[in-house]
Every structure is written in C-alpha cells, then in structure tokens.
C-alpha cells in the first residue's frame, strides 16, 4: 500500500513539472490560463475583453467579435477548429470552420457519386 502511494505521488509530481514546463514554454493548454482584461477609466472590464487571451499568435487571430441577434450584446467566439498544422486544406486554403474549401467539397462530391 505504501509503495502505491509513493508511486502515485511521484506520478502527480511529474505531471505538475510537465504542466509548469508547458506554461513556461507557452505550449499546450497553457494559453487557456492566461487572460488579459481591458478596463475603462473606472477600472471596470470593457466589452473589448475577450473570454480568453492567447499567447499564441496563431490562435489569437481567430477570435471573432459577434453580436447577438436577440439582445444585440457583443461576445467573442473562437472561429477555428484546427491547429496550426491542420489549418490549411490540401489546396493551401485556410479553413476556420468544419466546411471544406470549394475544391475539396467538389472533389468529395465527385468521389461519392462515382
């Protein structure tokens, strides 16, 4: 029993060290824990504050400010489903949604109809 507790404690320490390394390197899930608040002159958060602030320039550009159709309140939404390596389709076009580019969709339609 004591050996199992020691093994578990060692495993948790290793995970903690790995998490600290990812945060220091700015990789992995570290960007989720970093947020910058924009404030007005009364030091209150403004609507310009996105839900999360990323340290990664690749991810930062894909936050889009949208407006609610019902109450017209503005909110931020992440507009990409892909990492830096997978963002481009085989035709070299950037994709921010799950939809394919026109060439990819046309090719897929031809393959399914054949």
Curated annotation (Swiss-Prot):
GO BP term, pick one: viral DNA genome replication
UniProt KW keywords: Host nucleus
One cellular component term from this protein's GO annotations in UniProt: viral replication complex
Domain of life: Viruses
InterPro entries listed in its UniProt record: ADV_NS1-3
Subcellular location: Host nucleus
Functional description taken from the UniProt entry: Plays a role in viral DNA replication.
Name recorded for this polypeptide: Non-structural protein NS2
Organism whose genome encodes this protein: Aleutian mink disease parvovirus (strain G) (ADV)
Biological classification of the source: Viruses, Monodnaviria, Shotokuvirae, Cossaviricota, Quintoviricetes
């Amino acid at each position: 029993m004591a050996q199992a507790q020691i093994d578990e404690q060692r495993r948790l320490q290793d995970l903690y060290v790995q998490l600290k390394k990812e945060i220091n390197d700015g990789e992995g899930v570290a960007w989720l824990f970093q947020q910058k608040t924009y404030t007005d002159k009364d030091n209150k958060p403004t609507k310009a504050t996105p839900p999360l602030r990323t340290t990664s320039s690749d991810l930062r550009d894909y936050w889009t400010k949208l407006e609610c159709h019902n109450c017209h309140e503005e909110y931020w939404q992440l507009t990409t489903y892909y990492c830096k390596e997978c963002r481009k389709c085989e035709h070299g076009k950037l994709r921010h949604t799950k939809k394919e580019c026109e060439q990819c969709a046309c090719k897929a339609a031809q393959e399914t109809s054949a």
